């Protein structure tokens, strides 16, 4: 009998779904990687000032939506590029139904410039619950995934080369003389740095002049008081890096649900904390996210509040 943390009340096997979504994300990633080899910036469209979309975003989304419809035919969609016409309601589905939240290429600007990281992000939600989160980083071939109550993991698939598994450190489970087709990958856990040593990621939104004064105040507040500050250009990957202990904290405002939904679950299942900019635990319908290792969360929130107060003087 399977443990409770692998199922929801309606019988969904979340672990199985997570691994199936990993395969779908990898398939989309392979398409993106292939298209990048012959990509031309002349094929890029502007959605807003400094916010871009390409035929690769749309092609990846179509591939993902088609595969997810086969996996859970009754589920709805929230997609960045809106290719799931007829199902894409642009908001959370009702409390009973499941909804896929898809970013087919998070970090499009990075992709355009051939600058890592960029990723595929897929989440399954129901009401106020994030059930499954999968983020596949294409350049490093890393798949981060989690399911509610089951933990967060990295690379739960064997990597074959010349008929042999590249995972030579004993992590791979063998079955009938070969690699077992699926298994839980490396468990993820957030880091333990305090604010003085923290590696902090502060993303800048593309299209919001209102946020410019805030980010200036934030950098002024934290610069010299944390280990270092970074900007990586992908919300999904910033969240995964927090989950893996590569970053200690990440904050961004004016972003879409598809940007953060999968990564947020991965952080929480890795032992981290996620809120919105107001410190509220229910962040799923908002446009801001703050994710940390937990240790530095209050310090980061104080910095956000200090920045706001400075602008009100």
Where are these predicted regions, by residue range?
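N-terminal subdomain of lithium-sensitive/metallo-dependent phosphomonoesterases centered on the IMPase/IPPase/PAP
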Residues: 1-105, 310-313
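Arg/Gly-rich low-complexity intrinsically disordered repeat tracts
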Residues: 3, 9, 157-178
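Residue-level signal for inorganic ion chemistry
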Residues: 32, 57, 68, 108, ...
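Generic detector of well-ordered alpha-helical packing
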Residues: 58, 62, 81, 104-107, ...
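DPxDG-like acidic metal-binding loop motif
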Residues: 90, 94-153
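Short hydrophobic/aromatic-rich beta-strand segments that constitute the beta-sheet cores
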Residues: 133, 152-155, 183, 202, ...
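Short helix-loop capping/hinge motifs at secondary-structure junctions, enriched
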Residues: 152-154, 181-183, 209, 296-299
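An extended, acidic
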Residues: 188-313
């Amino acid at each position: 009998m399977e443990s409770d943390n692998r199922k929801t009340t309606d019988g969904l096997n979340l672990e199985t779904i997570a691994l199936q979504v990993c395969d779908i994300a990898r398939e989309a990633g392979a398409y993106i990687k292939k298209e990048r080899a012959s990509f031309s910036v002349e094929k890029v469209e502007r959605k807003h000032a400094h916010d871009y979309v390409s035929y690769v975003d749309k092609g990846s989304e179509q591939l993902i939506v088609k595969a997810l419809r086969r996996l859970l035919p009754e589920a709805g969609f929230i997609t960045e590029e809106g290719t799931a016409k007829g199902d894409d309601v642009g908001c959370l589905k009702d409390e009973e139904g499941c909804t896929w939240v898809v970013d087919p290429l998070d970090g499009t600007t990075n992709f355009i410039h051939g600058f890592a990281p960029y990723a595929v992000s897929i989440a399954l939600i129901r009401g106020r619950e994030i059930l499954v989160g999968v983020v596949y980083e294409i350049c490093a071939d890393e798949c981060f995934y989690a399911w509610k109550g089951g933990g967060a993991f990295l690379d739960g698939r064997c990597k074959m080369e010349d008929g042999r598994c590249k995972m030579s450190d004993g992590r791979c489970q063998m079955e009938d003389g070969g690699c077992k087709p699926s298994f839980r990958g490396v468990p993820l856990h957030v880091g333990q740095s305090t604010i003085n040593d923290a590696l902090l990621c502060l993303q800048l939104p593309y299209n919001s002049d209102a946020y410019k004064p805030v980010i200036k105040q934030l950098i002024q507040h934290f610069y010299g008081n944390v280990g270092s500050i970074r900007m990586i250009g992908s919300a999904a990957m910033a969240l995964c890096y927090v989950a893996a202990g590569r970053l200690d904290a990440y904050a961004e405002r004016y972003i879409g649900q598809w940007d953060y939904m999968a990564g947020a679950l991965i952080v929480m299942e890795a032992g981290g904390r996620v809120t919105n900019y107001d410190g509220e635990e229910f962040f799923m319908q908002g446009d801001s996210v703050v994710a940390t290792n937990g240790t530095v969360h209050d310090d980061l929130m104080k910095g956000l509040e200090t920045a706001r107060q400075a602008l009100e003087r």
